[in-house]
């Protein structure tokens, strides 16, 4: 949801005002509402971090309802992880989904999207580390604003072309800037029809992501299913890619976000 001109309080009133006027319940939010461009910035927690740490670091925002009643919105913090080479990675909102996904101890999960997240959790459900893969954004940039999109035609999903792209991506780690050009040459050489090129490019990028992100896993971790958290169509695509990589997968419950928010609110003592 896009909020225009910083009118966060008005949007909250429009969406929840009638309900809040008759319910004295806790208000909790997570995700980009707590970003630097959001309602109020909620500081990042350093990994490893779990529900109890998030519950102790909620950022509060005073809210005035249409009837004049005053409430408090609690915003969950995001997470940051510093890799061995010094670069930081961050997430906002995905941590809430991870905690709400009812993962087994010591799991790994993937949250597909514009900025796909791979995360590894500990024995108590805490997020140990994670990686961001800009797969969705790169697809959009290549398909809409680059030369790779010149031959593309939008059509219904072509999974055979997607699978072909995944297979190429899986065996091309370390050659990302080279192999994505195949989404043009495959069209020029007649290997893939214009209608199939978007799926072919998508497959290449997701294949590169799966190969790169899973490379660090040991044999024990690779033997466990990857939990996919997110929108159905994207998760199905990632499921296909994981299977082609020889990895088992499963879906999280659909209420991961709201369940995660409930767990944070409960740990913070906001629930009766």
Model region roles, listed by residue range:
Residues 250-272:
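Glycine-rich phosphate-binding/hydrolytic loop that grips phosphoryl groups
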Residues 14-26, 210-222:
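Phosphate/pyrophosphate-binding loops at sites that engage ATP/ADP/AMP, CoA/4′-phosphopantetheine
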Residues 19-88:
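Short beta-strand-loop/turn "lid" adjacent to the catalytic site in phosphate-handling enzymes
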Residues 169-210:
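Adenine-nucleotide phosphate-binding core of ATP-dependent small-molecule kinases
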Residues 1-25, 34-37, 41, 150-151:
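N-terminal phosphate-binding loop and adjacent alpha-helix
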Residues 223-241:
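Glycine-rich phosphate-binding loops at beta-strand->alpha-helix junctions
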Residues 26-28, 107-111, 227-228:
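Short glycine-aspartate micro-motif
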Residues 4, 78-169:
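Glycine-rich phosphate-binding loop plus the immediately following alpha-helix
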């Amino acid at each position: 949801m896009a909020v225009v001109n910083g009118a966060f309080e008005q949007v909250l009133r429009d969406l929840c005002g009638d309900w809040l006027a008759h319910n004295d319940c806790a208000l909790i939010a997570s995700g980009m509402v707590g970003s630097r461009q959001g309602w109020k910035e909620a500081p990042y927690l350093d990994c490893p971090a779990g529900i109890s740490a998030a519950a102790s670091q909620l950022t509060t925002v005073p809210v005035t309802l249409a009837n004049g009643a005053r409430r408090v919105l609690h915003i969950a913090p995001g997470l940051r992880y510093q890799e061995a080479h010094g670069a930081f990675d961050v997430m906002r909102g995905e941590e809430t989904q991870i905690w709400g996904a009812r993962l087994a101890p010591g799991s790994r999960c993937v949250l597909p999207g514009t900025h796909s997240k791979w995360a590894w959790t500990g024995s108590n459900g805490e997020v140990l580390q994670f990686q961001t893969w800009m797969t969705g954004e790169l697809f959009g940039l290549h398909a809409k604003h680059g030369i790779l999109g010149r031959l593309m035609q939008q059509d219904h999903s072509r999974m055979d072309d997607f699978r072909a792209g995944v297979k190429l991506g899986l065996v091309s780690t370390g050659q990302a800037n080279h192999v994505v050009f195949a989404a043009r040459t495959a069209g020029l050489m007649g290997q893939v029809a214009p209608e199939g090129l978007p799926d072919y490019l998508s497959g290449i990028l997701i294949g590169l992501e799966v190969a790169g992100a899973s490379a660090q896993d040991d044999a024990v971790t690779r033997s466990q299913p990857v939990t996919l958290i997110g929108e159905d169509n994207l998760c199905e695509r990632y499921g296909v890619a994981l299977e082609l990589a020889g990895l088992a997968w499963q879906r999280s419950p659909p209420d991961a976000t709201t369940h995660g928010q409930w767990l944070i609110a409960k740990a913070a003592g906001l629930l009766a």
